[in-house]
C-alpha cells in the first residue's frame, strides 16, 4: 500500500479559504467532516491509503463548524462526504466510507493510473 506521506491533509479554516483553493488549485480532494464523526476517521484512513498515488491531488479537510455555508452550498447533510474538485468544479462525490479500492478506481478515471497494488485491483475489475 502506498501511504500518503508526501501529501498530508491540510485543514480548511473557513469558506473564504475553500473558495480561494478552488480558484488557485488545479485539483483538490476535500473530506467534509465534523469532530464527533468516527466514520470520518475511517474515511480519512482509506483516502490516505490511495491519495499518495495521485500527486496532482492535494488532500484537505473541511469541518462543518468551520464553514457551514459550504456544506449548505453542496447540499451536504451528513458526513463523511468526499469531493474531488478539478478546475474549480466537483467531478466526484463519495458518500460515507468508501473502500480504498473504490476511491482509487474513481480517481484513476480522472487522473490516470497511479503506482500501487490498487492499480492491479482496479484493472482486474
Protein language model regions, located:
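Short pre-active-site segment immediately N-terminal to redox-active cysteine/selenocysteine motifs
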Residues: 33-36, 78
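Structural micro-motif
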Residues: 74-83
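Thiol-based oxidoreductase modules, predominantly thioredoxin-like and allied folds used
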Residues: 9-13, 32, 55-69
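Non-catalytic, surface beta->alpha helical segment in thiol-disulfide oxidoreductase systems
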Residues: 83-124
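N-terminal leader/targeting and pre-domain segments
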Residues: 1-28, 108-125
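Chalcogenol-based redox active-site neighborhoods
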Residues: 2-3, 73-74, 100
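The canonical Cys-X-X-Cys-His
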Residues: 37-40, 82
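Typically the conserved alpha-helix immediately C-terminal to a functionally engaged Cys/Sec
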Residues: 41-53
Amino acid at each position: 500500500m502506498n501511504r500518503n506521506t508526501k501529501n498530508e491533509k491540510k485543514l480548511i479554516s473557513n469558506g473564504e479559504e475553500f473558495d480561494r483553493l478552488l480558484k488557485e488549485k488545479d485539483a483538490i480532494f476535500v473530506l467534509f467532516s465534523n469532530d464527533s464523526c468516527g466514520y470520518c476517521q475511517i474515511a480519512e484512513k482509506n483516502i490516505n491509503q490511495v491519495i499518495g498515488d495521485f500527486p496532482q491531488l492535494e488532500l484537505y479537510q473541511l469541518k462543518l463548524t468551520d464553514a457551514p455555508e459550504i456544506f449548505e452550498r453542496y447540499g451536504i447533510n451528513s458526513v463523511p462526504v468526499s469531493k474531488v474538485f478539478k478546475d474549480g468544479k466537483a467531478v466526484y462525490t463519495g458518500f460515507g466510507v468508501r473502500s480504498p479500492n473504490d476511491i482509487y478506481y474513481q480517481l484513476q478515471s480522472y487522473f490516470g493510473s497511479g503506482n500501487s497494488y490498487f492499480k492491479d485491483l482496479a484493472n482486474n475489475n
